[in-house]
Amino acid sequence: MARVVAKSLGEVTSIITKGVAPKYVEEANENTVIVLNQKCNRDFSISLEFARLNDCREKSVPQERMLREFDVLINSTGTGTAGRVAQLFAVTEPMTIDGHMILLRPTDEIDPLYYGYAVKSHYAEIEKLAEGSTGQTEINRKRLETEIRITFPEDIQCQKKIGRLLYQIDQKIRNNKEINNNLVV
């Protein structure tokens, strides 16, 4: 049986940063990247339906803020939206996040897929980290790093098995929702 450890989110996170303040354009071209915003993060998943485009000639995006497969995204502002968590399972085009989202990437100590599920399991706690006046709440990143505890098996192969199992269950749920939506039509 694998030994299980618990560490603060900050200890198992290599990058925790907010997104960029984009310069939006309407038409895609070779100088644009997709920008995810809070509307894109719902029900623990990312939808590109409300994504916009940033003109990189006007506002460059640091390489570390370009999104990768298995990145975890948290909405950082707003009553009712701050604290929403989702994980990217595929990044097929260059994309980043705006300044109202937080990007998390794990250290090498933890499997990225497992990490996403571990962070999502703390959604209710993360949501409570929002501070500020009504309508202007924001997730406190220092508290996010120190107060959220991630529990994981030390054996990375065990982490990978758990992450894959949870992903397969989520895939079945997505497939069932799609079937149900087709039945309604």
Question: Where does each model-flagged region fall?
Answer:
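Non-catalytic DNA-recognition/assembly elements of restriction-modification systems
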Residues: M1-V20, T151-V185
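Sequence-specific dsDNA recognition surfaces
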Residues: A6-E26, K39-D71
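Structural signal for hydrophobic
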Residues: L9, L36, E147-I148
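A short beta-sheet element
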Residues: N37, N54, P62-H122
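Short helix/loop capping segments that flank catalytic or ligand/cofactor-binding pockets
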Residues: F44-I46, R84, P112-L113, E127
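A short glycine-rich beta-alpha junction/loop motif
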Residues: P94-I102, S133-G163, Y167
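Short, positively charged
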Residues: D111-R143
